[in-house]
């Protein structure tokens, strides 16, 4: 079986859109992970502040993503696809978030270094 790779070579035009969603843990985590892969600044108002969402933020910060969190807004300075910057033998703590553990893995696939994802006792049993 042959594998074919393709790359998107056309630049996407800069755009500015506002989306309103309910404060949902799953959506908040996915938004953080997606915007970490964008180039530029992404903002979310009233992002959910659950333990799982905060675990996602800490994991992304360890991967070199700059994130500013205030009482009303979260700002992510995206690094682009495969733009993470980190040291060898990195350990990411997903806490109790299976969503963070599962969804961050594909973003790390191109890393030349070993990255260990850990969690609390509950997550480690899953």
Annotated model-derived regions:
Residues 1-126:
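Short, structured segments at the rim of ligand-binding sites
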